[in-house]
Amino acid sequence: DGKQAHLSQAAKELPNKKNRIMLVPFEELLKALNIQCRTEKNGRKGVLKKGKYDYHGKTTRTTYKYSFATYIKKQYKRTNQASKKEYKRLLKSSGDVTDRFQYMRVDTFREIDPEVFYGYYNNQIEIYCRINKMSKKKSVLYGRKNAKALLGAAKKYNLDPVYFACQTFLESAYGTSTLAKGHKIGKKKVYNLYGIKAYDNNPEKYGFRYAKKKGWTSISKALEGAAAYLSSGYIHSKYKQNTIFKLRYTPNKGLWHQYASDPFYAEKIGGKYQEMSVCYSQGAKYLYDMPRYR
């Protein structure tokens, strides 16, 4: 369309007497042309799709209880898994590397393209299993049926489905963790995808005991349990932690009620969220909630 695009990696010209041949990094070219790429199966096949999605939306701001400098100190004191310099970057919106997806409101069910979602959902699991040298059948989440169940749980509890998929992948090691794969108690097998109530001194014992108590006897029931846990405990709770950023970096005084201890949690989920955003339907609406420090 005649617009200039800046490449982070320079193109290289090949010597050729007849034609001018330029080598451009594939991912850079797709980005410049606004083309979405999704690989399938064993990575030999893929789908190129002309970008038609506009992720622009309204932006609101949440006022935090502390100044920026004070908040950095308090986060560092609470969890020193990152340096103060790293916290400064993580907490400042200008340091965002997720294209604002860590600030996307996830307290609503956005419409997705089901076929794109099913393909991308399974592809993510396949990639994880291939990297970890295991069969995709080792994942209890794999398959169209489970992808549909995840969408159903997200809709029931009013969660963004793409976010919920990303969160579920992280919590369950893409459906391959011990708690996710389930355990038979009595006559029924139970599943705990998020490791809820799986206390450190004996996570399997307590995790499966809680799953039995809640009746998570199938993957669909375990997904509903996970969605209910996120919805009532965090995203739609009185704490209103309705973005990935606020789940990790609570605006509440005393740093009370943070979902994760990993300082890089919001970036990790946000990065995966950005990657899977191609699953949204063209008419999806977006709302961002950015932090404002005192």
Predicted regions and their residues:
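Primary recognition of N-terminal secretory signal peptides and signal-anchoring hydrophobic helices
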Residues: 1-58, 64
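Short, glycine/acidic-rich beta->alpha junctions
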Residues: 21, 142-149, 158-161
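Solvent-exposed, polar/charged alpha-helical surfaces in well-ordered, non-transmembrane soluble domains
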Residues: 27, 31, 148-152, 165, ...
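Intrinsically disordered, low-complexity repeat and linker tracts
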Residues: 29, 48-81, 226, 286-294
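Peptidoglycan-targeting cell-wall enzymes and recognition modules
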Residues: 62-63, 67-143, 172-238
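Short, functionally critical alpha-helical segments immediately adjacent to catalytic or ligand/cofactor-binding
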Residues: 151-154, 159-175
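Non-catalytic cell-wall polysaccharide-engagement segments
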Residues: 194-294
